[in-house]
Regions:
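Flexible "arm" and connector segments at domain edges
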Residues: 1-69, 73-113
């Protein structure tokens, strides 16, 4: 698959493009149109893609699931870019949790009201 961005670089490259779309013409860019519509439109898309991912996961077609997961990741990255949350912050949080029991990590989280 010549010409593809190496997997380790894909998220960062995509994030940079999503940042650039903040100043793009909403008539020419799907992402710019989401930014113009605001957070609620982005959150709605994430919800739709999450539901579609769940439906795809119930079926044996792994390729369909991969496509839905890509849609979900993409729209989550749109939200991250809108909020200026760099992917390194999320991977840093995952690294912080790595090697810790899920039960122990959850118990150590600050309680919210």
């Amino acid at each position: 698959m010549a010409g593809l961005i190496p997997p380790g670089d894909m998220i960062g490259e995509l994030y940079r493009v999503l940042q650039d779309r903040k100043t793009a013409d909403p008539g020419a860019s799907y992402v710019a149109s989401l930014y113009r519509k605001g957070s609620d439109a982005i959150l709605k898309k994430i919800g739709e893609e999450a539901a579609e991912t769940l439906i795809a996961a119930k079926n044996p077609d792994d390729e369909a699931l991969v496509r839905e997961l890509a849609d979900l990741w993409f729209h989550t990255l749109v939200l991250m870019a809108q909020r200026d949350i760099e992917p390194a912050r999320v991977t840093g949080e995952l690294a912080r949790r790595f090697g810790t029991s899920g039960h122990a990590e959850k118990a150590a989280r600050p309680r919210t009201s």
